[in-house]
Amino acid sequence: MTATLEVILTPAEFGPLRERDLSQTVCVVFDILRATTTMITALANGADSIIPVEQIGEALEVRRQRPNVLLAGERDGVRIRANQTGGIEFDLGNSPREFSAEKVQGKTIVMTTTNGTRALRACATAKTV
């Protein structure tokens, strides 16, 4: 059995992944500066689940369908604010410190980030992520 390792370093490289058959691929996503660390922190502090989405609009659509979810995310390192969404302030940014048990325990979190959630979504069709 031959194994191949591919390293993708920037969001610009995600596009070609979407065009490939990843059904027999294992994707490992490390966004060590924020997104995956924040997700692990949320789950460790009792969050029920995290729904990663690529775009702010997708997060807002999930909130419309499921009003009890928390919205979390950033663009270029700054929490998403009401002026970016047409008036809806995100509940959390993308810092592990924000995801305390008091805020996230028992909650579903919809998360969108500049890089991390996009990397996860690019690998969505993989056999294992």
Descriptions of predicted regions:
Residues M1-E61, P67:
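N-terminal glycine-/serine-/threonine-rich phosphate-binding loop
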Residues V53-V129:
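Acidic/Gly/His-enriched mid-domain segments of enzyme catalytic cores or analogous surface patches
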